[in-house]
Amino acid sequence: MPPHLIDGQPHQHIDRPRRVRQPGEPLRIGIGGPVGSGKTALVAALCRTLRDEISVAVLTNDIYTTEDADFLRRHAVLPDERITAVQTGGCPHTAIRDDITANLDAIEDLIATNEPLDLILVESGGDNLTATFSSGLIDVQIFVIDVAGGDKVPRKGGPGVTFSDLLVINKTDLAPMVGADLTVMARDAAAVREGRPTAMISLTEDPAASEVLAWVRAHLTEAHQTDHAH
C-alpha cells in the first residue's frame, strides 16, 4: 500500500471521543516507545506467530520514510497488502495523539483491503518517554523501552512508562553489558505503574516474545467474548 502522508504543516489538537470498539471490528493495539527500543522487532515477532491464528495487519508511523513497514515486508512477516505506513513528518507524536486523521484513514484502507481483520497493530514513530496514543485511535497500548538507556528509565516515568496498558522492558540480555540492574528496573516500574503489568523480554532469548504474546491473546479473547455477548 502507498504511504499515507501528513503535510508537515503545524497541526492543531483535534479532540476525539475515546474509541468504543464495535462488534466485529478489529482490536487495535498501539505499540510505542523511543527510537531503537525494539518496537518493529516486537511487531515482527508477534506477526510471525499470530498470522497462523488470526487475521492481522500492521500500520507503521515513520518520520520521513517507510523504513519500518519496509523492514516488515522484507522479512515477510505478513503479506504486503497487510502492511501500510503513515509518514508523520518531524513530529511523530502528532500523528498518533493530536491529529490522528492519517492513521484513521490508513486503518480504513487496511480494513477495506483485508476484511475481515481480527487485529491491527499500530506502531508509532520513535519518540521520547512522553509519547502516547490517542484513545480515539487504539483500544490498548504497549510501551517499549530497553535496557540500553540504563536502569533509571522506569524511574523517570513519563506517560508511556506509567500509563500504558503493558510496559515492555526489552533487550534484557544486554543488561550485563550496559550495567543495568533488571531487579531495579522491575521494582521501579512496579512503583510507578500502580498494578499495571510489565513484561521483561529478550527477543534474542525468546524470539516469540511469549509474555507479550500471551497478553495480546488475552485481549483478543476478551474482544471475541464481548462480540459474542452482543
From Swiss-Prot:
It comes from the Bacteria. Belongs to the SIMIBI class G3E GTPase family. UreG subfamily. PANTHER family: UREASE ACCESSORY PROTEIN G (PTHR31715:SF0). This is Urease accessory protein UreG. Keywords: Chaperone, Cytoplasm, GTP-binding, Nickel insertion, Nucleotide-binding. Facilitates the functional incorporation of the urease nickel metallocenter. This process requires GTP hydrolysis, probably effectuated by UreG. GTP binds at G33, P34, V35, G36, S37, G38, K39, T40. GO terms for molecular function: GTP binding; GTPase activity; nickel cation binding. GO terms for cellular component: cytoplasm. The keyword Protein transport does not apply. GO terms for biological process: urea catabolic process. It is found in: Cytoplasm. Homodimer. UreD, UreF and UreG form a complex that acts as a GTP-hydrolysis-dependent molecular chaperone, activating the urease apoprotein by helping to assemble the nickel containing metallocenter of UreC. The UreE protein probably delivers the nickel. Coiled coil: none annotated.
